[in-house]
Amino acid sequence: MSLQFVLGPAKMDHRRTMVAQLVATLMAKPQDQFFYLVPNHIKFDTEVDVLNRLAQAFGQPDLYAQTQVQVFSFTRLAWYLMKNEAAYQVPRLSAAGIDMLLYRILQRHADELRLFGGEISQTGFVTQLAREINELQTANLQPEDVVQLAANAQAGDLQAKLHDLAIVYKDFVAATADKYLKPADILVQLNAYLRRQDLHGTHVYVELAGFAQLPAQEQGIVTTMLEQGADVTISLMLDHKVVDRAPENGTLFYQSGRLYYRLYQYARIRQIPVSQDIYAETPRVAPGLVALDDFWRGQPQAATGYEEPNTNVHLFRTDSRQTELAQVGRMIRAMVAKKHADPADDYHYRDFLIMTRHLDAYQTMLAPTFHELEIPYFVDLQRSMADHPLVELINALFDIDAQQYQYRDVMRVLKTELLMPNINGQPMDRQAYRQAVDLTENFILKSGYHGQRWVQREDWQYFQLTEGDAGVETDQNAEISRQINLIHHFVAETLPPFFKKMRQAPDGKAAVTLLVNFLTSQGVTDQLLAWRDQALDRQDVRAAAEPEQTWQTFCGMLDEYVTILGAEPFEITDFLALLQAGFEGASYSQIPSTLDQVLISESGMVQSQDHKVVFMVGATDLVMPDRIMTNNLLSDVDKENLQLTLSSLDGDHYLNDSAVVQLGDESCLNYLAFLSARRHLFFSAPLKDDQETDLNWSNYVRRIQRQFNLREHTYLGTPDPTNADARPFVGTKRRTISHVIQVYRDVLTTNTDRNRVGAPLQPAPVWVWLRQQLTRDPQFGELARQLMAGLSYRNQPVKLTPASVEALYGHQIYTSISKLEEFYRNQYAYFLKYGLKLRERDVFELSAASTGEFFHAVLDGLIKALRSDQIPLAQASDQQLGQYLETVTRQILDQPQFTILTSSNRMAYLQRQLINTVRQIAFAIRNQSKLSAAEPKQTEILFGNVGKEHGLKALDFQIDATHSVHVRGKIDRLDQIQVADQSYLGIVDYKSSQHKFDFQEAYYGLAMQMLTYLDAVLHNEQALVGSDQAAVKLAGALYMHIQNPTLKPKDIQGGFEAALLKKNKYKGILLDDPQLLEHLDSELQQGNGTSKVYPFARKKDGSYSGGRAASLVTNDQLERLLQHNSQLIIAAAEAIFAGEIQLNPIRLNDKTTALQYSPYLSIMQFDAMLAENAYRDLPPLSAKQVLDLLKTQKGGENHE
């Protein structure tokens, strides 16, 4: 029985000294038992290394076996000693099971808890509580100890926390005692077991040199071993003994010094012999790292500088984190590729360790960077299971039932691809399934189906109506309906019976049985196995392990649930919450996929000291030292107060260190990380973060740089074309070609700069050579040539071939005028929208188009109803008009396309707003009619619609012998004014926003609607007036803004009705015909003034004016406008048939562009900075300029 310390700084080979002591004792006492204990995290590597050293010591380097020496972690030692003990055979309770049990305890005691009761539903709280319970156990605190601490605490938050912890902890211990073995119980059981053993002849070697702390439970095992007669040797990272008093917080070796002091005092009080300290004396690191160790342990203020160049410590900065990782990868590849005279000096991937304080900032970059560099790597961090599709399936499955089949929940289940329909007894093909799910999602987004719609037996009917449809279901629509209903009926036939059985389950065991049977029968386990096999085929061992681990964890939680709560009445809500709590604490077991791979970890974790090279990435002042943030139920202040009272309890009790203590340990933690390297230590940091904020070197690094006068290298993500040193950018062929492309792109951009002077830029010869090598490579050359060809790519669409034009458009174009307006805004957008027929998916929403359709339908129905009953609109009373409106509105709202207006309370409110608006407009139109001789003749007049029995002729234009264009449309309202034998026909277009007739846009083809509609009226005048003898003139084209205007007090000074008339005043163009204008507004027949209804005024001399808007045009001017509009239609059709698809978005008045609201930006990739991409700027034109241009232009001349 004795205690022996092996001391020394991190630069020394502690293990060499420990193994030497072990060998000497083993040779002297070969029949004794030897245990070599290390942290679980590095057990495997340590075991291999210790056995290799023993083999060398005993002269058996090729083949060596040892039965007396065991290398274990503390938990593995428990298994070795107690595997046949009854106490060790009880069922294990996993972290997930602990969370489930704690959740149930919190529920049971919710009324007694002062603080924790309200936190049960908070995400992460149960896991946080589990950590706190575990800390109490590892501190050797029993429930009665916590009760005593609560009683002694002053009233306040701490007392309330301890009160709640005591209740939960007591119930937790009672629920698990002799029933389950928790992770924290294993060491308690081991301690109890050791107290019953005679350990004389047992030699224990505890290696703590690679880290600083030993938890209270493990300290208890060491002291028990000493008491029971074992010889214990402990290696500590400590350069001096600590016997008289405990070290002060903040000193470099505070943690190991404190442990030395505690164990020394323990042995001294119990008169256990303490042998003379042994110091490790053999350096395990290169000379430059020895110097770093000496410097770090000295007084930086008194340092005189390192006289010899330090070739083992290196610094570099990069322009970004991504460049930083790429540079680390290139260095690793270069070092592995270099061969030395002595093979022992060669590097393997396993010789490299990449560390940073927190990996979060690099997490998303690791896989793409190292895969591209073809570097095998292993991230040594636990990953949560919470995001696995199986977990999502379970959560979403029960959410469907709880939320009554909401869209999001059903889609969450379907998109896990774990529940899939069977076709002829086999799982549905995955690609076909995805297509069906996507179509179903589009359909329900469009139709708003949710809730009981999912479980109805009737088929869902898919329809897609577009302009020109004849109302006949197509084969394509029928196929889409089939796919949608496949998913619909799968949900309807699969889920409701399952939910019904679950609700009827009498207890937890029955419910779990139903759930497992359901998942198994639906092929979930088969799908998980298929995922595993697919990952193995890809040689992705990590991904292959995830499905099995998740399913095993899930089944383990169900077993624990049945054991704990299986006999109790089943509650779905509680069951799901317990599963969620369980998965919250579950993580994957990390399994390296190969022995030779780069290790990536965090500097706060225990690391093996066998790595030859360490990269400390992200070495900024934000994380070195780290900003310690605690997220524990017991705060640092709570722990400080508790630590003062723990001494009053029996036994040794040590809580986890507070943030203050941890911050004091940062220097030691980083010291251990630095000295993890044996040959080389690299510090790196980006110059800026992702938000372009400047980042600075850590003060630790600055001190090291000053001490050793280290040169700092800077690496950029983009190479300098003129730099002959390409080594920082040479990696794999794929990685290197990307940098070659960057160089040649830079050269091309520079040489095409219009402002450049001097000789053309030429790339350095090394880049020319690299390009040649890569493009001529037998395996990689074809891809390299394709990638290099991208340099000559121009973002410019290629003209369509005649065959493509015919396939897309045929020989005849049937079009609305708005499509041709799109063509004039941007030819390529027209091609995407109407050639390829790309469009955004429909959603169940009240769009501007939907509200416009409602307004049009109501006003159309109102006027037709009045005409049917032979009631002139101007003579309809307020009561009559209100009754007609109510009837028509009710009929319109019953139509399927307006069901959205009854889908929610918000939509019901919007429905009332729409009804109020259309009512106001109807009364406004009636009041306008009272002042005018114009009467609505027809509404919603179709012209040129294929498949319609009623309607007017299309506007037909023959382009050439084989091509033609036919324009169709719908006129909202046609007004007629009869003056003696002269008929005037005018059109009114309803708009949901302010519109006016824009001569400039009409000239450029951006606003052709009104002129096209007037032309259609002119071509169908006889059919419209019902006589081929009548004299007909066009009255004009007017916009009416559909609105329920807001009136200010000043607006109604002239009367309320007059104010409303002014707000609803027509805008547009009218024929400058005195006879017409005189009858348009009866108030102006006897005097002058501005019309309240129409956009004109009568002057004192009796003439008429259109004002600034140039609303009045002569007959000749109107004819020229119509002729020019026809020319625009023909010119557009000619360009379309010629295959023109230029990316030529217009820009008007230096602010309005064709791309402002385009849904195709990601396809167009338009960039005005590119030489080949430029806006088509349209010179601004006034109304007078347009009319003058049309007067001087001759027929057929280009409008631009």
UniProtKB/Swiss-Prot annotation:
Record keywords, A-Z: ATP-binding, DNA damage, DNA repair, DNA-binding, Exonuclease, Helicase, Hydrolase, Nuclease, Nucleotide-binding
One Pfam family of this chain: PDDEXK_1
An MF annotation (GO) of this entry: ATP binding
Coiled coil: none
Keyword DNA damage: yes
Signal sequence, renumbered to the chain: none
EC number: 3.1.-.-
Enzyme class: hydrolase
Cofactor(s) the protein requires to work: Mg(2+)
Gene Ontology terms describing biological process: double-strand break repair via homologous recombination
Known role: The heterodimer acts as both an ATP-dependent DNA helicase and an ATP-dependent, dual-direction single-stranded exonuclease. Recognizes the chi site generating a DNA molecule suitable for the initiation of homologous recombination. This subunit has 5' -> 3' nuclease activity but not helicase activity.
Miscellaneous remark of the record: Despite having helicase-like domains, this subunit does not have helicase activity.
Family named by the database record: Belongs to the helicase family. AddB/RexB type 2 subfamily.
Subunit note: Heterodimer of AddA and RexB.
The name this protein goes by in its record: ATP-dependent helicase/deoxyribonuclease subunit B
Organism from which the protein derives: Lactiplantibacillus plantarum (strain ATCC BAA-793 / NCIMB 8826 / WCFS1)
Lineage of origin: Bacteria, Bacillati, Bacillota, Bacilli, Lactobacillales
Gene designation: rexB
